[in-house]
A protein has these predicted regions:
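Cytosolic-side transmembrane-helix boundaries in multi-pass membrane proteins
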Residues: 1-33, 41, 240, 247-254, ...
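Interfacial/capping segments of alpha-helical transmembrane domains
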Residues: 39-61, 179-190
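Single transmembrane alpha-helix segments in multi-pass membrane proteins
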Residues: 44-48, 54, 58, 63-118, ...
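Short, non-helical or kinked segments that cap or interrupt transmembrane helices
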Residues: 49-54, 91-110, 151-160, 234, ...
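Hydrophobic alpha-helical segments embedded in the membrane of multi-pass proteins
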Residues: 77-88, 109, 140-144, 163-166, ...
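Transmembrane helix-bundle core of multi-pass membrane transporters
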Residues: 157, 161-228, 366-367
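Helix-loop-helix "hairpin" substructures at the membrane interface of multi-pass membrane proteins
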Residues: 204-281, 305-306
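Transmembrane alpha-helical segments in multi-pass inner-membrane proteins
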Residues: 261-267, 273-341
């Protein structure tokens, strides 16, 4: 080859976009969802020979078919949103808190312990206050352990918080065995079923409305906290650059510990609502992987609590709809998971085209 031969250009270049208007961003996301639905429809016809329109109608039926289903969907949305709100300050600070699952479990365990040990020994109103304080403290303490080691010894918070999930599971498992009722069942059943001691109050006859209103209030407070408060500003600065934060005089270690106390405390509230208001029992699966799903919710919403309502709704809708597909059509659960996975893949992939554009060789055509 000649030394002066021109280098061959790559087929395309990936170039970071300037910030897109929100209308165009949402247009790209909607286009991704439509493309995913078309692909899922083709797969449905090829693999199952079912009418894809019937399958999609069944998904909607599974989520909204009855009033009970609608309230179940809103309850699931509220719980996922609550955990998502909890992990968001840490993620915005670039502290990779993978331990939301364990923090919810520990908050739930503290709630269950108060109900089990103090039920009937104090007025119910006082017991509920004790439960609230205990769950917030338990979640916050569990979260601040990895934060302390990160701030003091620069440990890897991803591995630390992930491993603490497994420790939390084993602690909950131990107390479930200790309190099991009846003996040998490996369950503790409904706590205080006859006295309802420690059960959170209901609004009218609706057992979910209180949870939904609490999480809605938390969403508004978190939005204001992150966007308008001094602490929210400090979280943003530390997330952008710890060196810059130190240069302008911020105590980075203090911000890390304070933010994780907040994250753990809100996870503790999620545990309180799950145990004291919804399930009235504790088990190792009560968090139902929300600690991990919340990470996706937070990232897709770009750490905006208001946008998280939409992303939480989408994920919960897909979960409820996919479950209904399996039941109605007698399909393997894996197929409904395939549909969910494809839709999520396209949604996550659309974020690439929101943040980047492709410049092709010769024509330099932009893919928008």
């Amino acid at each position: 080859m000649k030394a002066n031969q021109k280098k061959r250009e790559p087929l395309f270049h990936i170039v970071k976009r300037d910030s897109l208007p929100w209308q165009k961003s949402w247009l790209i996301r909607i286009g991704a969802i439509v493309a995913a639905l078309i692909l899922c429809a083709l797969l449905t016809m090829i693999i199952t020979h079912e009418n894809p329109i019937s399958v999609y109608a069944t998904m909607i039926e599974g989520a909204f078919g009855t009033q009970r289903r609608m309230w179940n969907l809103l309850q699931s949305l509220a719980m996922l949103l609550c955990v998502s709100l909890a992990v968001t300050p840490a993620f915005k600070m670039r502290f990779w808190n993978i331990g939301g699952e364990g923090q919810v479990l520990i908050g739930g365990l503290a709630t269950a312990a108060c109900m089990y040990l103090l039920g009937g020994k104090m007025p119910n109103a006082l017991l509920i206050i004790v439960m609230i304080v205990a769950s917030i403290l338990a979640g916050a303490i569990w979260a601040v352990i990895p934060a302390f080691f990160k701030a003091k010894f620069c440990t890897n918070e991803t591995l630390f918080t992930l491993m603490m999930n497994y420790v939390a599971i084993q602690i909950v498992s131990y107390f479930v065995m200790l309190w099991e009722n009846p003996k040998g069942s490996s369950k503790i059943g409904i706590i205080n079923q006859s006295t309802h001691a420690g059960w959170m109050p209901t609004i009218g006859t609706n057992e979910y409305l209180l949870n939904i209103l609490i999480v809605l209030a938390l969403t508004i407070l978190m939005f204001v906290y992150l966007k308008y408060s001094k602490h929210g500003y400090e979280i943003s600065v530390v997330g952008e650059s710890e060196n810059t934060a130190r240069y302008i005089g911020l105590n980075v270690k203090k911000v890390i510990i304070r933010t994780m106390l907040l994250s753990g405390g809100i996870c503790g509230i999620a545990g309180l609502l799950l145990v004291g208001s919804t399930n009235h029992t504790i088990s190792t699966t009560i968090a139902n992987n929300r600690g991990f799903t919340a990470i996706m919710v937070s990232w897709l919403a770009k750490f905006n609590p208001i946008n998280m309502i939409l992303t939480s709704f989408l994920l919960v809708f897909l979960e409820k709809g996919a479950s209904e597909i399996s039941t109605v059509f007698g399909l393997n659960q894996s197929f409904s998971d395939i549909i969910t996975g494809i839709i999520l893949f396209f949604i996550i992939g659309s974020e690439f085209f929101i943040n980047y554009q492709l410049h092709f060789r010769h024509s330099h055509k932009e893919v928008k």
